[in-house]
């Protein structure tokens, strides 16, 4: 019997290979945390379709665990950065962003945010140098003859490895700070008059003041903020590739940009042929819950349950804040499942159970779930959209503020500030979202939009990866604007030329006028003298 199953799986993989022309070899340069969870969903599907997937794993990565992905091949290489260093940095980043970073305007981010990003840049440059300078690793990759590389541009270096190996590469990306990478390297069209800048915390139709804030954010990220220190990265890329180049220019050679978002979360804006939206690719129908959790959910009766999770990256929550949250949860008639890894609050009510881990997707897909209290991570937001669950957003850091702002603008959530939130604020927010049908209606509307696509998000991602492998590249989809320097892209040379022409014409017109004036003035004077 097992032999029959193995044979059936082999036939299934062969059928996928025939359908996609051939089975390819995919190299992956990943990022940690939720970035890895998203890209792993794509990789698992590629393996199911018969492709060979190899993941480059820096030894400093501490979340990415090869043991949990037996179907994937891993090439682990040593790094000068240790796991402890990287873990401490990300904890510091998350805590500083959550509790210290001012959010009045984007200008208030500086210099704290810039300092943190400089440290981020230094860590990843070190990891990149360790990979590219590892002759044994690079020789092995050359011999493997990969067809394509899949990377997350938030962790730069994948594009450099692809260039060294002379293979095409694609990006999988949620968003970069201020859309900096998308605009400078992808030539995305994102007018600040109606497209909220990532990390602005804005959403929906903007007022005049909102547009002023949005413009300040755009200018800040375009001219002052640097996610990667170009002074270090550009010379390194130039040295390795043996020609003058920059990090931004190399990133711009991506064949496709697979953006982990969609119009259920985003607001409409112009897009490009080599960009597709795959938000919610990790979402799937709910599976049965473990018996103990199912029994607790069923005990809620007609009131239902609330799912509470603020993610896994925030390491510290004060005892006072935890008690305030527990008190608010204890006041509602719903049962509550709270993902929490701290000291059990003294005010925890009998209706609330605390778990270190929850089957979040399966809970959100349960018919008794009434609301989701979330930090606003894209994965959790998309699972809520997928299942049509309204949200109470308590954003912590990164684009979480933007995700929740978008959900608020679309009428599927309310938002609270983790720093100023009182127990009554949370209690009132829970009552509002659970009892007001407005939020459930809009959440279901977003769910309908998400499900009503010509192709599932995961299938779109696989299609484009296989498309690039079939055609070797996708240059015919890349806008010619990639070949232009910034001043030509914005037509500044043409504008300058036209202004110069106008200036010359104006000068000639003035000279002609003066010549005619003087001619007639002299003639009139001569006539008077006669």
From Swiss-Prot:
Q: Which reaction does it catalyse?
A: glucuronate acceptor + UDP-alpha-D-glucuronate = acceptor beta-D-glucuronoside + UDP + H(+)
This protein's major location comes to: membrane
Instruction: List cellular component terms (GO).
Output: endoplasmic reticulum membrane
Q: What is its EC number?
A: 2.4.1.17
> How is this protein situated with respect to the membrane?
Single-pass membrane protein
Q: Which residues form the signal peptide?
A: 1-23
Q: Does the keyword Coiled coil apply?
A: no
Q: Name one Pfam family in it.
A: UDPGT
Q: Which superkingdom? A: Eukaryota
Which key words tag this protein in UniProt? Endoplasmic reticulum, Glycosyltransferase, Membrane, Microsome, Signal, Transferase, Transmembrane, Transmembrane helix
Residues crossing the lipid bilayer are 494-510
Extract the GO molecular function terms from the UniProt entry: glucuronosyltransferase activity
Q: What inducers act on this gene?
A: Constitutively expressed.
| Compartment(s) | Microsome membrane; Endoplasmic reticulum membrane
* Family classification: Belongs to the UDP-glycosyltransferase family.
Q: What does this protein do?
A: UDPGT is of major importance in the conjugation and subsequent elimination of potentially toxic xenobiotics and endogenous compounds. About 30-fold less active than Ugt2b17 toward testosterone and dihydrotestosterone.
Q: What is this protein called?
A: UDP-glucuronosyltransferase 2B37
Organism, scientific name: Rattus norvegicus (Rat)
């Amino acid at each position: 019997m097992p032999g029959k199953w193995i044979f059936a799986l082999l036939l299934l993989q062969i059928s996928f290979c025939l359908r996609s022309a051939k089975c390819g070899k995919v190299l992956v340069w990943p990022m940690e945390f939720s970035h890895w969870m998203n890209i792993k969903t794509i990789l698992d599907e590629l393996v199911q379709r018969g492709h060979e997937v190899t993941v480059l794993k820096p030894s400093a990565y501490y979340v990415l665990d090869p043991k949990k992905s037996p179907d994937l091949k891993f090439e682990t290489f040593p790094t000068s950065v240790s796991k402890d260093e990287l873990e401490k940095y990300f904890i510091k980043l998350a805590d500083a962003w959550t509790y210290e970073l001012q959010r009045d305007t984007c200008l208030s981010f500086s210099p704290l945010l810039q300092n943190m990003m400089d440290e981020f840049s230094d860590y990843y440059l070190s990891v990149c140098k360790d990979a590219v300078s590892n002759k044994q690793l690079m020789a092995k990759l050359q011999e493997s003859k990969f067809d394509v590389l899949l990377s997350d541009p938030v962790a730069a270096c994948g594009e450099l490895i692809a260039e060294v190996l002379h293979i095409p590469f694609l990006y999988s990306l949620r968003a970069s700070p201020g859309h900096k990478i998308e605009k400078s390297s992808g030539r995305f069209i994102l007018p600040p008059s109606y497209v909220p800048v990532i990390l602005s915390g804005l959403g929906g139709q903007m007022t005049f003041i909102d547009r002023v804030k949005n413009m300040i954010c755009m200018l800040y990220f375009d001219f002052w903020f640097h996610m990667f220190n170009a002074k270090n990265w550009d010379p390194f890329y130039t040295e390795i590739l043996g020609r003058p180049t920059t990090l931004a220019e190399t990133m711009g050679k991506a064949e496709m940009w697979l953006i982990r978002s969609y119009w259920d979360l985003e607001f409409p804006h112009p897009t490009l042929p080599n960009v597709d939206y795959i938000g919610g690719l990790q979402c799937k129908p709910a599976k049965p819950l473990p018996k103990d959790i199912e029994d607790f959910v069923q005990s809620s009766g007609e009131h239902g349950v609330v799912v509470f999770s603020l993610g896994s990256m925030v390491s510290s929550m004060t005892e006072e804040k935890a008690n305030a949250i527990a008190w608010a949860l204890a006041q509602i008639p719903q049962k509550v499942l709270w993902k929490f890894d701290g000291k059990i609050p003294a005010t925890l009510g009998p209706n609330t159970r605390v778990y270190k881990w929850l089957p979040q997707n399966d809970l959100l897909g349960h018919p008794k779930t009434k609301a989701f209290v979330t930090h606003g991570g894209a994965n959790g937001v998309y699972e809520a959209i997928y299942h049509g669950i309204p949200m109470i957003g308590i954003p912590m850091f990164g684009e979480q503020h933007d995700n929740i702002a978008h959900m608020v603008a679309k009428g599927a959530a309310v938002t609270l500030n983790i720093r100023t939130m009182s127990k009554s604020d949370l209690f009132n927010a829970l009552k509002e979202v659970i009892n007001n049908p407005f939020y459930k209606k809009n959440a279901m509307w977003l769910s309908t939009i998400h499900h009503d696509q010509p192709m599932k998000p995961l299938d779109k991602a696989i299609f484009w990866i296989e498309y690039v492998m079939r055609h070797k590249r996708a240059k015919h989809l890349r806008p010619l604007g990639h070949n232009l320097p910034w001043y030509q892209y914005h037509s500044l040379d043409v504008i300058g030329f036209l202004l110069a022409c106008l200036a010359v014409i104006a000068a000639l017109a003035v000279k002609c006028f003066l010549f005619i004036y003087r001619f007639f003035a002299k003639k009139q004077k001569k006539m008077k003298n006669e």
